[in-house]
């Protein structure tokens, strides 16, 4: 009987642990116009590098308006 109880508790613990790991969700992100990027934005990675290194944000991308937009957590 004791082995069955230990096995059942172990199984329950594993199920709860897996359920907790699945419940983790991704943070929402927002885009803002870069505060300090100068010049036209062309898709060569400068905007992304600028947003990460100078503004300490998640990423950056050039949009159709040739301006640099940085991505941050909302």
Swiss-Prot record:
**Gene Ontology annotations of biological process type:** defense response to fungus; killing of cells of another organism
- Keywords in UniProt for this one? Antimicrobial, Disulfide bond, Fungicide, Plant defense, Secreted, Signal
UniProt signal peptide: 1-27
The places in or outside the cell where this protein is found are: Secreted
Q: List the disulfide bonds.
A: 30-74, 41-62, 47-68, 51-70
Which SUPFAM superfamilies does the entry link to? Scorpion toxin-like
Q: Which GO terms describe its cellular component?
A: extracellular region
Described function: Does not inhibit trypsin or chymotrypsin.
Family the UniProt entry places it in: Belongs to the DEFL family.
Supply the name of the protein.
Answer: Defensin Lc-def
Organism, as annotated: Lens culinaris subsp. culinaris (Cultivated lentil)
Q: What is the lineage of its organism?
A: Eukaryota, Viridiplantae, Streptophyta, Embryophyta, Tracheophyta
